[in-house]
Amino acid sequence: MGPVQKEQTREQVVARLISMLHQAHAMGAELVVYPELALTTFFPRWFVDDITQADHWYERNMPNAATQPLFDEAKRLGVGFCLGYAHLDERSDGTVHRWNVQTLVERDGSIVATYRKTHIPGHEHHEPDRPFQHAERYYFEPSPDGFGVSCAFGGIVGMAICNDRRWPETYRVMGLQGVELVLIGYNTPIHYVPDPSQDILQGFHNALVMQSGAYQNGTWVVGVAKGGVEEGVDSLCQSMIVAPSGQIVAQTLTSDDEVIVARCDLDWCAKYKDTLFDFDKYRRPEVYGRITSQRGAVLPD
């Protein structure tokens, strides 16, 4: 998906999403995956002292008046979709939570699941020396739920968001639940402020982590970018569909709204799950204790 500028309304963005839905349907797609924070610009690039001044970037309900046309048209066409957005979770006890989420919708229009982002990157406080902010840790809480999967679209489907894709635990936790299709939306600035030497490697790293996650868990991975120049910040494009073999079977070529399609044969997953990555036969969880017992590295004496 191409950039969403600050002045664009949700209604304008939803019209773009519906246009891509029509293109995908004409190409035979049964499931359309949209990127992280698809309905708005990537607002964590700005910092506001009063976080409630950013509430207009969040959705309180899904669907809502702006997104209902997408839900209606998808149901009419018999096409499911996965949509990323910011969720303002106002609870009856008066607490307010802010999540970065993806909602998976089946072909009949029913909501299958909503996933909350687990690995929140960036910083919590204003860093005025940056050319732009990446204040996700200010605007979003990390998920308390982790990585679940759902039976949908004739298989076992899981979700992840942006920075989640860089962590092998993301794929493995879902792999241990038999996942066959992982849906990932992302916004990735090409300029990485903490270490600009990584800028030139953004595309390489993007493919590396999704191809590795697919292969090592015998699953399809669909990674979808909101890329291009958005409010002066250039973000990675390179949406791709990765097979359980780790091979890229389709990839976007532009920084505009673009639709790619692949036939994802879920039976292909068994070629890896039942052989080299037969978890029950080959895994050694008794020696993996450090993965869950500690957070940071503990160096040897």
Describe the predicted segments one by one:
Residues G2, Q251-K271:
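A hydrophobic, small-residue-rich beta->alpha segment in the mid-to-C-terminal subdomain
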Residues Q8-D108, V112-R116, G122-H123, T188-S212, ...:
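Cys-nucleophile CN-hydrolase/nitrilase-fold catalytic domain and related Cys-dependent amidase chemistry
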Residues D89-P194, Q198-L208, D274-D278:
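Active-site catalytic loop in hydrolytic enzyme cores
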Residues L104-E106, V242-A243, A262-R263:
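Short beta-strand-to-turn element immediately C-terminal to the catalytic PLP-Schiff-base lysine
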Residues Y115, S150, V224, T252, ...:
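Hydrophobic residues at beta-strand termini and immediately following loops
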Residues D267-D301:
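A short C-terminal boundary segment appended to hydrolase-like catalytic domains
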